[in-house]
Amino acid sequence: MFDGLCEYEMIRMRNIMERQALFQSLDMEDVKSELTPSRPKHVPSSRGLASVKKVTEVLPPRKSARLAGGLVPDIDRFVPLVEEPEEDNIASLEDLSIKDAFVRAEDEEFVIRTKKLLFDLKFEPKTRHDSTFTPSPSFSDLDWSLSQLTITDDLVAKVVPDRIFSVSLHPGDTRLVCAVAGKVGHVGLWDIMTRDDRFSNGVHLYQPHTRPVNTMNWDQADTSRLVTTSYDGTSRVLDCGLGQWRMLYGEKQYLENGGWTSCHAQQSPNTWLISQGNTGSVVLVDTRVGWELPSTTMKCFERLNPKSLSVHPKQPNVYLTGTNKGGCFIFDIRMARDSSLMTPVSELSGHSRSLSSCVFSRDTGDQVATLASEDKLRLYDTSYLDTPVISPQCAVRHNNQTGRWLTPLRLTWHPARPGVLVCGSMMRPRQIEVWDTEGGDLRPAAQLTGEALGSVTSIVDIHPTRDVIVGGNSSGRCHVFMPAE
């Protein structure tokens, strides 16, 4: 059996065969299969937009004319290159009809369905945003309600074809609709409870912009209007009643000079704050006057980008903004003077790198939470805005290194539970974090996770009156956590 082998090789082969016989007698493979239960591989949800595979062109193989026996053509090495004209990517400043902005405008039946959805949102019962709202006992019990939130494959859908930059849940009481904005100007409306393969399982996709839609929210005064601000230098309003994407802000001369906008915040039912990225200014736009020119321009920074905007809920003249170099400041609109640089009311100290999010608490504005690239989640006490420099009440380590291909993490305060923060996470298993800020401390309250959540959800939003939390990832998918039916 071991002919031709040396003595050492014979001993080695004999030992191997003895061990194999021992394992077979012990039935180790059967024991292993019993101790390790079979777990089927999770298949991602196929709801929403269908994934389009890019067809790569197969080039013919290169052949050498010299080796083939042919003549090598003379090459003029000094032929000047022909420069291709640059594409004019300036955003349109005209109102768009629903059909003009709708991606599947050729499908007449789908167009009728999307118009019906907008018509229904026009008459959706409005959520009460004032302080008289009284939640049910189960709603006010934070620990209990968070424990009831689950996610399944049916609650995951691809809403936009690329990276998600903003998410906003419609605050209506009866219909659950989520607006999602993407990298190349897409805005998708997802009717979460609708399941119909013929019409993308309730996903209605528009493209009113040409560049990333960095900020989007439903109008607090009229929830039938969705406001979007894009890097293409314009802000638009989806008016469900009129069935149009109307202009909110856009200056032709500013766009022709390479201008762009990054975010917005609502100051009152008719006025909006919009940041100009390359000038360091924040403009005040009054919809009663018109969208061509802002009513007030406030020079906040010199050669810095106001990356985030938040208006004080009790003092609408006060707003908060952070920069791409680490500064975080509170300004007062009443202190704006022509084109001169504004003096901040207060500075929130401690930031050394770019801010991805800074927001006032929704109930009183007495707290501010910030996320910055130096891997910190900070909490500030802003009860007294006359303090020139405000130090953080609490700062905890938080991994904010999303890298190049993921949208930076953002914070949001719970609209109906004071002192509760929600944000995305880089931790594994993938999760959405809930933080409790009672007493000025940052304490983890819960981690929302599930088998259907397999990616980083950088952007999150919360329904004001229902236990629903939604997160968007960087491949266009939305994940919804809600109580099981």
Question: Which residues does each PLM region occupy?
Answer:
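Active-site-adjacent structural elements in folded domains
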Residues: 340-345
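Calcium-regulated, polybasic anionic-phospholipid
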Residues: 335
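WD40 beta-propeller repeat fold
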Residues: 102-314, 318, 322-325, 329-330, ...
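Intrinsically disordered terminal extensions that flank WD40 beta-propeller domains
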Residues: 1-164
